[in-house]
Amino acid sequence: MKDRLQELKQKTKEIELSRDGQVFVEEEQGVLVQQAVIYEREPVAERHLHEIQKLQENINSFVDDVQRFGQQQKSLVASMRRFSLLKRDSTIAKEIKIQAEHINRALGDVVKEVKKSEVENGPSSVVTRILKSQYAAMFRRFQQTMFLYNDTIALKQEKCKTFIVRQLEVAGKEVSEEEVNDMLHHGKWEVFNESLLTETSITKAQLSEIEQRHKELVNLENQVKDLRDLFIQISLLVEEQGESINSIEVMVNSTKDYVNNTKEKFGLAVKYKKRNPCRALCCCCCPRCGSK
């Protein structure tokens, strides 16, 4: 009987070659249907990221102005301040108010974008999560800066009141802090009457200094009144979104911890892989594996 095994092998090779050639021709002709990897559908976030970056720059500028204003108020000493300095402080306060209102409106727009993204893309989409985390971080920083500005104004008010009380005590007139607050509240500053010069040993220079402090207090009171509505809006936002902001902050912190732990584990895995004796033995025995 004739051995036809070699003939069978040759025929098998010819069939395989013909199949490969047919597949190659079909690919060249575009007959095969292309299969693409379809990722999760997410809208383009470049516009949102650009707006967020611009808002972050505005908040950074706002923080710098508030900190600069606070440093200037720390230099308040027990001496008469010129009217030009009071006018400059008033101008800075107006600029801070304009910045704060602008940032507050921009944060409100971000909240609207978050709600819109939740409806269109879902609460777990990448864009929605980015907007939420960025809003939480920016709002928290804006809130802390506003509290710092409020504390700065309150501290300046206390310094002015203390100065007035101390100057009147030196002049021989006892005035309590409650009386000063009442005078400020009702606007009855009878301590500036000319009769005070005859009743006490206060000089015109001391009276002029007290009047300057009075102007500062009135100016500060007006600044607080101007920002009252803004503080109310911030407090309402904190009540409405406080829990969500806290949960977002917790999630971001936990994600950072998880990423750090993962990096450490990857580093240990690479180190253990290099020290694996079996791998070293295989590399020596199998040069082809070692080259890989």
From Swiss-Prot:
* Pfam families (alphabetical): Syntaxin
Q: What biological-process GO terms show up in the record?
A: intracellular protein transport; vesicle-mediated transport
Task: Give compartment(s).
Answer: Cell membrane; Cytoplasm
Keyword Thylakoid on this protein? Answer: no
Q: List the CDD domains hit by this protein, alphabetically.
A: SynN
Q: Identify one Gene Ontology CC term for this UniProt entry.
A: cytoplasm
Tell me which residues make up the t-SNARE coiled-coil homology domain: 207-269
Q: Spell out the Gene3D superfamilies in the cross-references.
A: 1.20.5.110, 1.20.58.70
Tissues in which the protein is found = Expressed in stomach, lung and skin (at protein level). In stomach, strongly expressed in the mucosa of the fundus, in epithelial cells of gastric pits, and in gastric glands (at protein level). In skin, expressed in the epidermis, dermis, and epithelial layer of the hair bulb (at protein level).
State the annotated membrane topology for this chain: Peripheral membrane protein
Keyword Cell inner membrane attributed:
no
Q: Which PROSITE patterns match?
A: SYNTAXIN, T_SNARE
Q: Which UniProt keywords apply?
A: Cell membrane, Coiled coil, Cytoplasm, Membrane, Transport
Do you know which SUPFAM superfamilies this protein is assigned to?
A: t-snare proteins
What is the role of the protein in this entry? Plays a role in endosomal trafficking of the epidermal growth factor receptor (EGFR).
State the family named in the UniProt similarity comment for this chain: Belongs to the syntaxin family.
Mind telling me what this protein is named? Syntaxin-19
Write down the species.
Mus musculus
What gene is this protein translated from? Stx19
